Amino acid sequence: MEERKGRRIIMFPLPFPGHFNPMIELAGIFHHRGFSVTILHTSYNFPDPSRHPHFTFRTISHNKEGEEDPLSQSETSSMDLIVLVRRLKQRYAEPFRKSVAAEVGGGETVCCLVSDAIWGKNTEVVAEEIGVRRVVLRTGGASSFCAFAAFPLLRDKGYLPIQDSRLDEPVTELPPLKVKDLPVMETNEPEELYRVVNDMVEGAKSSSGVIWNTFEDLERLSLMNCSSKLQVPFFPIGPFHKYSEDPTPKTENKEDTDWLDKQDPQSVVYASFGSLAAIEEKEFLEIAWGLRNSERPFLWVVRPGSVRGTEWLESLPLGFMENIGDKGKIVKWANQLEVLAHPAIGAFWTHCGWNSTLESICEGVPMICTSCFTDQHVNARYIVDVWRVGMLLERSKMEKKEIEKVLRSVMMEKGDGLRERSLKLKERADFCLSKDGSSSKYLDKLVSHVLSFDSYAFAS
């Protein structure tokens, strides 16, 4: 641990697990390099500060005692995700400004603000008004950002909005993507999606730099493309989660680990579809039967509420789990880093969220790719066609026989070298964090960049 530099970094994550987790990992990286860190977080989805004792947490809220939260959990439970992002940006804009002003005027030198890219130009306005430099964190990959940045072109060329008749056509401007791989999602307000994406891209262009949770050897061409488009300093210092000096924390419930310990090496399919994705009951049942019929041991994470219309496992046929016995295990949550690192894991059936993609790459685990929305589609295409460490299982083909076929193919490999390529990619990920690796060098540049910012004080 380096000595405190007497300088503070303010961080503003988007309040979703897939965005908060990499931001808190980045906070740990800065803390290890001697910076103090303050996390400004919305009262919506506010985390448990006791889990992160090295950082100062501030709740962003303009509530007076007894007033309703500006964005209640009940209000957002059934809300269109794009509409939710818009509400977050609208309702927390002024509380955010007041919070940053209070922090900058608090005495300790504030080096910069690090904000999630999706907050967009909202944070730029505040940073300029208060007089603090702003650096953007892109929690997703560079490849998907290139696709987002191309939205105006894609609309001009007629790729967007997506037409069902063109799903399998190649997007010649963004190889190897097909039309169905473009990072869109179902929304009642498609124009709002375009506005959110444009605001994210323009906010990155006007920043003092972009931090990427990726590594150069994985996305070199995409990073070069992004650098050319954005024309700001860029720092691909990932994978963030590999910087931690502490071993992966063990779960309080040892049942998962004990079960994995009893399985043969590389024999288990681990299935988990992220913190936001929801599936229909029919899909859930096809997954269940596909896993069972594959005759491979499986560990399946099913979040409560992730199957529409049910609380958890009520849809399973009577006696299903008893019939599986010790060959399969369904849980509400699993320590994913711990699971992927276990020698029993032979494949990861994933929604292809960026954090999950990186975690699987870092453990050399081949992937079965079932993307759900936005950047997950791009990630899946790169996993399958560029890095060649996975197989595609599209949601439109979620039928038990197809599931069984793909699971067997990945686990048996059929000579296609999935596992060998996965292990080679793992080696490249390991090297990037070594002393001479690209991520380590970019981290040194990032620290120097942040320290080069002039000292700013809040002028009232």
UniProtKB/Swiss-Prot annotation:
Uppermost EC category: transferase
An MF annotation (GO) of this entry: UDP-glycosyltransferase activity
Entry's EC annotation: 2.4.1.-
CDD domains listed in its UniProt record: GT1_Gtf-like
Taxonomy, superkingdom: Eukaryota
Transmembrane segments: none
Keyword entries, A-Z: Glycosyltransferase, Transferase
Keyword Glycosyltransferase (UniProt): yes
Span of the signal peptide: none
Binding site residues for UDP-alpha-D-glucose: 275, 334-336, 351-359, 373-376
Family: Belongs to the UDP-glycosyltransferase family.
Protein name: UDP-glycosyltransferase 76F1
Organism: Arabidopsis thaliana (Mouse-ear cress)
